[in-house]
């Protein structure tokens, strides 16, 4: 929503309220600035006509649509159809929000005429007795098969694979009006929440990074710091075999900030293989804060991890590969190798 709206639970303690506000403010900053959310922050819904800057209203409209058809068709029938749609809600195209909006696949109503297979183009022969040598049966059959495959490809629908399965169904499936409207609701919301899935680690890491700084440097007083530390520890706790996006995100942002503050980047750093020199490397460049704001804007989880998850970070954070030992009935470290992690 624009402006963003957040809610506080009335029964929370004051420490919890402060923590939630600090955390949510950082989330809002991420929503407003990360490229994955640019369609929502600019008011463009990638796949339908609603203005996503007013998603409080859009969600209310979606609810009104569903209730309208539930009253007319029956709540059980509508719920069953929506459940079926929700089972497909991840079958959308992550790239489509960044493409032009002129999404117009061929209509299934268009009659496709049967395509006749053209005659096989034979090589010219001046002498009839040379025909079997110049155009042998194997060659003719191969050419016939090639032409038949091309004719079949021309009849295929859609001609090219379509990643946005929900959009394809919306445009081409023989749906009743109420089914089409309900499917459009599910699809619009799937696209709206897509950036959340693409940036879960970064988003939670950014919010945790800033709530940690705000709470310890500006907001908490001495009487609240222990309670805050207890709440924060429970959020950042990790267990073997599980990935905590809050913990991984905050530590990776801190790692980036520390590296760029010390100048641990660039060709000279990459080419250095002296472990002792790397351990004490500090060029005092102080570019860490600038770098993490750049990362916040230009990366998603895949590129974030691919670019900044280094072997040094894995060793420092003990991000080992765990496996379950059935003999001991417990999780154990299987590998400490960076590539396997």
Regions found by a protein language model. Name each.
Residues 31-108, 208-221, 234-245:
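Post-HExxH zinc-binding segment in Zn-dependent metallohydrolases
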Residues 109-172:
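Long, low-complexity, polar/charged, intrinsically disordered or flexibly structured peripheral segments
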Residues 152, 168-173, 191-197, 236-240:
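Active-site-adjacent structural elements in folded domains
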Residues 186, 194-217:
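Hydrophobic/aromatic-rich, well-ordered segments within soluble, folded domains that form packed cores
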Residues 15, 227-341:
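Non-catalytic terminal regions of proteins
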Residues 15-32, 204-212:
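Active-site recognition of the HExxH zinc-binding catalytic motif
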Residues 1-3, 173-190, 225-226:
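Active-site-adjacent bridging/hinge elements
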Residues 3-20, 194-202:
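Short pre-active-site segment immediately N-terminal to the catalytic Zn-binding motif
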């Amino acid at each position: 929503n624009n402006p963003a709206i957040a809610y506080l639970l009335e029964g929370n303690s004051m420490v919890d309220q402060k923590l939630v506000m600090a955390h949510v403010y950082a989330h809002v900053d991420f929503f407003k600035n990360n490229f994955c959310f640019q369609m929502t922050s600019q008011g463009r819904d990638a796949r339908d006509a609603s203005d996503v800057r007013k998603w409080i209203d859009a969600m209310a409209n979606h609810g009104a649509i569903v209730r309208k058809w539930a009253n007319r068709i029956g709540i059980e029938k509508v719920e069953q159809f929506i459940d079926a749609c929700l089972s497909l809600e991840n079958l959308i195209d992550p790239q489509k929000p960044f493409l032009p909006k002129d999404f117009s696949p061929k209509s299934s109503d268009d009659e496709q005429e049967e395509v006749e297979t053209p005659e096989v183009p034979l090589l010219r022969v001046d002498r009839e007795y040379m025909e079997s040598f110049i155009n042998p049966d194997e060659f003719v059959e191969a050419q016939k098969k090639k032409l038949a495959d091309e004719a079949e490809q021309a009849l295929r629908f859609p001609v090219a694979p379509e990643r946005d399965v929900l959009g394809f169904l919306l445009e081409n499936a023989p749906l009743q009006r109420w089914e089409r409207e309900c499917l459009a609701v599910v699809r619009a919301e799937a696209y709206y929440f897509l950036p959340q899935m693409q940036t879960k680690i970064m988003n939670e890491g950014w919010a945790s990074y800033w709530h940690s700084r705000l709470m310890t440097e500006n907001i908490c007083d001495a009487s609240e710091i222990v309670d805050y530390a207890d709440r924060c520890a429970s959020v950042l706790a990790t267990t073997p075999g599980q990935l905590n996006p809050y913990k991984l995100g905050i530590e990776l942002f801190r790692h980036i900030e520390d590296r760029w503050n010390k100048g641990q980047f660039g060709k000279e750093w990459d080419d250095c293989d002296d472990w002792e020199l790397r351990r004490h490397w500090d060029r005092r460049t102080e570019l860490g804060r600038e770098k993490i704001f750049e990362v916040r804007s230009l990366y998603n989880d895949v590129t974030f991890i691919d670019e900044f998850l280094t072997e040094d970070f894995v060793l420092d954070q003990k991000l080992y590969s765990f496996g379950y030992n059935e003999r001991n009935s417990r999780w154990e470290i299987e590998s400490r190798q960076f590539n396997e992690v």
